[in-house]
């Protein structure tokens, strides 16, 4: 199975599918549709049915039930796009057989080294087969590992009809990394009782809590005057923006928070004297605290507007997704089945909140409860990203075992 996983995964990552938040089309980049069509062809070749690719790049397919039992339809999802944080063009995956536990030189010329000194968890993978970058791009394990694992699991079930299962639906979605993955996802057409995203990190991750999330854009408007004659006339938009940012709690930022702690995160800033813009994301697990964070931003903007004039400040707040725990807890069995599947395979489940979001965060509020399961990857969204093929194989086995357990329990 390892070679099958490697072949699939390395072919997927070579397609540039980086999404683009500045493009309102769906998918936001043509490479995503290219990969979607490739995946549809592969689904057909392994024996899946009801395969569709719509104009928005959503791939769906069915593995029909091979049992007479009344088993709820389960879905498995992964997203085709890669993050905007680092380039995903010309990905050149490197395969490290029987990792020796020492430094991995990703790129000698650029002196890019994946070291257990900097990334201590790397030592846990000694003896395993790793796939890394060449030091110039991200890898794309987020989330092409999930695609490879779902595809391999479906191929395995088709080749092993002795493993009984209910109807399984598969979907590969666009634009998850820019928060739009489920926006045009047809839950009714997908027609599953519940689903799992295969979009987590290290072995054993099982997640059914996510952030509540919002985006904020602050635009400041100033008055540009020649600096030689600016006294009592100039209003510097960039300084207003700086004042706003410094009013936010310094310790409530990603680099200072963990676990269930929320944050304000400055994504980008640009400007001059006349106009300046700050883009933020707001995150918190608690719904009330989430509301308080948005209110604090609004009050800060209002105070600056009172100081510099109402025309000097514009704050736009937009909710992105909510903590999916609220929708999953009423059907907690789906978490319990995934937990048992891992235990059956001698995998220690790690139940922890997602300090981020998945398609499941939004899908759960669209009527499709969707927890998240590990892929086996580490250091997503950058040149130090890597994944264990051994753990990818375990993810495949978990998918198969989940399908088997639901049939057994029916």
UniProtKB/Swiss-Prot annotation:
Which SUPFAM superfamilies does the record match to this protein?
A: Bacterial exopeptidase dimerisation domain (SSF55031), Zn-dependent exopeptidases (SSF53187)
Q: Which GO terms describe its biological process?
A: peptide catabolic process; proteolysis
Q: What class of enzyme is it?
A: hydrolase
Q: What is its EC number?
A: 3.4.11.4
Name a Pfam family for this protein.
Answer: Peptidase_M20
Identify which cofactors the protein needs according to its UniProt entry. Zn(2+)
The principal location of this protein is cytoplasm
Family the entry assigns: Belongs to the peptidase M20B family.
Primary role: Cleaves the N-terminal amino acid of tripeptides.
Q: What is this protein called?
A: Peptidase T
């Amino acid at each position: 199975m390892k070679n099958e996983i490697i072949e699939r995964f390395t072919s997927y990552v070579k397609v540039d599918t980086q999404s683009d938040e500045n493009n309102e089309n769906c998918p936001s980049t043509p490479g995503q549709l290219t990969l979607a069509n490739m995946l549809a062809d592969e689904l057909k070749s392994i024996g899946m049915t009801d395969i569709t690719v719509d104009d928005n790049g959503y791939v769906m397919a069915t593995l029909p039930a091979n049992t007479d039992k009344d088993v709820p339809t389960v879905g498995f999802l992964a997203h085709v796009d890669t993050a905007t944080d680092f380039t995903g063009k010309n990905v050149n995956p490197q395969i490290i057989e029987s990792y020796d536990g020492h430094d991995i030189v990703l790129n000698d010329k650029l002196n890019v080294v994946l070291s257990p000194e900097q990334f201590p968890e790397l030592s846990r993978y000694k003896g395993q087969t790793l796939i890394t970058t060449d030091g110039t791009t991200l890898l794309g394990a987020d989330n092409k590992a999930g695609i490879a694992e779902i595809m391999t699991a479906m191929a395995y079930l088709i080749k092993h009809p002795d493993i009984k299962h209910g109807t399984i639906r598969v979907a590969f979605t666009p634009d998850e990394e820019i928060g739009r993955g489920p926006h045009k996802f047809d839950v009714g057409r997908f027609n599953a009782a519940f689903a799992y995203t295969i979009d987590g990190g290290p072995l054993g991750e099982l997640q059914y809590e996510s952030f509540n999330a919002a985006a904020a854009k602050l635009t400041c408007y100033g008055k540009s005057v020649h600096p030689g004659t600016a006294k009592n006339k100039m209003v510097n938009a960039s300084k207003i923006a700086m004042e706003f940012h410094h009013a936010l709690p310094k310790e409530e930022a990603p680099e200072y928070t963990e676990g269930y702690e929320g944050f304000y995160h400055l994504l980008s800033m640009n400007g001059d004297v006349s106009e300046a813009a700050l883009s933020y994301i707001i995150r918190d697990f608690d719904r009330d605290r989430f509301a308080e964070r948005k209110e604090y931003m609004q009050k800060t903007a209002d105070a600056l507007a009172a100081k510099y004039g109402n025309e000097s400040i514009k704050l736009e707040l937009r909710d992105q997704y909510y903590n999916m725990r609220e929708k999953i807890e009423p059907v907690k069995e789906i978490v319990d089945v995934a937990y048992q599947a891992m235990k059956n395979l001698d995998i220690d489940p790690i139940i922890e909140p997602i300090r981020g979001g998945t398609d499941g965060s939004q899908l759960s509020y669209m009527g499709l409860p969707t927890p998240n399961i590990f892929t086996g990857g580490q250091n997503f969204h950058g040149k130090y990203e890597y994944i264990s093929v051994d753990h990818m194989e375990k993810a495949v086995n978990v998918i198969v075992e989940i399908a088997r357990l639901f049939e057994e329990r029916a």
